[in-house]
Amino acid sequence: MKATKTTYKKDPMGLTPSQIVNELNRFIVGQEKAKKAVAIALRNRCRRKRVEGNLRNEIVPKNILMIGSTGVGKTEIARRLAKLTNSPFYKIEATKFTEVGYVGRDVESIIRDLVEIAVNTKKTLAKMEVDINAREKAIERILDSLVGKTSSSETREKFKEKILNGKLDDTEIEISVADTTPVGGGSFEIPGMPGASMGVLNLGDMIGRALGSSKTKTKKMLVKDAMAIIIPEESEKLIDQEKIIQQAINLAENDGIVFIDEIDKIASTGSSGAKNAEISREGVQRDLLPLIEGTTVNTKYGPVKTDHILFIASGAFHIAKPSDLLPELQGRLPIRVELNSLTKDDMIKILLEPETSLVKQYSALIGTEDVHLEFAASAIEKIADYAITVNLEVEDIGARRLHTILENLLEDISFEASEMKGKKITIDDKFVENQLSKIITNLDLAKFVL
């Protein structure tokens, strides 16, 4: 059964948990427990917004710990969830961080990056709202360059019509545009400096403000290129930057989702690595505690509270166990969800059912060369069989194994497709066997190829 897009009845609180699960089913196979957990977490956010009085601030999100091997859908569930709600979503690996005082990124940069995403989201929406006015102003600036500021309204109307019809797209003009060349080498962070905790120190911004940031330069360019540069410039002038920043901070604080992957790699196992490494891992966990529990992080846009940001942590936990995390951190991730390893049936469903399944992707790619690529049911079963075999014998990387198998399977077809226009190619089990059986039976080779 193929997952299809459904139109739902309007609910004042957005999608219901069952609707969220149905939406996730369009892209992700199985893992019902994990889908259910994130759907409830998302709905509880909407419920919290409708609670009145002081009680609303006391209701905090129940953060989630996903436990499962690589390639079973942990990241995809969180990513699709964020897209579903248009929430600012930030994914990071726990191994990227070091304890404060060591060289490397500190955990507060998570919130700074999340706010940056929220600001860009709000800016994009605001620019869409002012697009018509910005386009009008851009055309006026181009007309000034083409016919001069003192030209008659009749002349301007004639040229405006030509611009709108695209007749002047390849006409070269000389026009003043904002100088976006970075002054003083752009952005960087200075470890241990106050600026590092406030966000990124940008020398260009600092020097620009000191000298006056409205610097322009005259450039020669085609009308169509000028439109592409000037419309965003005019949009920036029309939107209320302070309002955007306030809305973005509010969006990040109340709807932000942070996905921390590989959290098992910072768990202290007591036997792996040197003592210093253990201390550093524990330090990162301790730095994460206030962030997940709720604190205020200073960013270049202003202070951001993390109390109502939803944190989803995940890890394979092959060597370490969830109980190896600091007890305080375990307590801040109260919902635990175990994701199942993928079976042969799951692999078959992954190849066929999602709206953006791999089979559909490869068929579409080869289809651009006017070649009709078709997969027989026997081929799908054989591919799934090989994926499970290699995962068991070499290393379990879940659904990601299908990518490497399909790339090897279709290598010759992808190479020769441009010379096969108008042809129909059917992939069956014999074709799969001919292409892959030698690699599958030689496990030493499979380790390197698949």
UniProtKB/Swiss-Prot annotation:
What GO biological process, any one, is recorded here? proteolysis involved in protein catabolic process
Q: Which keywords does this Swiss-Prot/TrEMBL entry list?
A: ATP-binding, Chaperone, Cytoplasm, Nucleotide-binding
**Where can this protein be found?**
Cytoplasm
Q: Name one GO molecular function term.
A: peptidase activity
InterPro entries linked: AAA+_ATPase (IPR003593), ATP-dep_Clp_protease_ClpX (IPR050052), ATPase_AAA_core (IPR003959), Clp_ATPase_C (IPR019489), HslU (IPR004491), P-loop_NTPase (IPR027417)
UniProt keyword annotation of Chaperone present: yes
Q: Which Pfam families match?
A: AAA, AAA_2
Residues reported in the UniProt entry to bind ATP: 29, 71-76, 261, 328, 400
Question: Would you say which domain of life the source belongs to?
Answer: Bacteria
User: Per the annotation, which location comes first and is thus the protein's main one?
Assistant: cytoplasm
Indicate yes or no for the key word ATP-binding: yes
Q: Name one GO cellular component term.
A: HslUV protease complex
Give the multimer and partner information.
A double ring-shaped homohexamer of HslV is capped on each side by a ring-shaped HslU homohexamer. The assembly of the HslU/HslV complex is dependent on binding of ATP.
Instruction: Tell me which NCBIfam families the record gives.
Output: hslU, PRK05201.1
Function of the molecule: ATPase subunit of a proteasome-like degradation complex; this subunit has chaperone activity. The binding of ATP and its subsequent hydrolysis by HslU are essential for unfolding of protein substrates subsequently hydrolyzed by HslV. HslU recognizes the N-terminal part of its protein substrates and unfolds these before they are guided to HslV for hydrolysis.
Family as reported in the entry's similarity comment: Belongs to the ClpX chaperone family. HslU subfamily.
| Entry protein name | ATP-dependent protease ATPase subunit HslU
Q: Supply the source organism for this entry.
A: Rickettsia felis (strain ATCC VR-1525 / URRWXCal2)
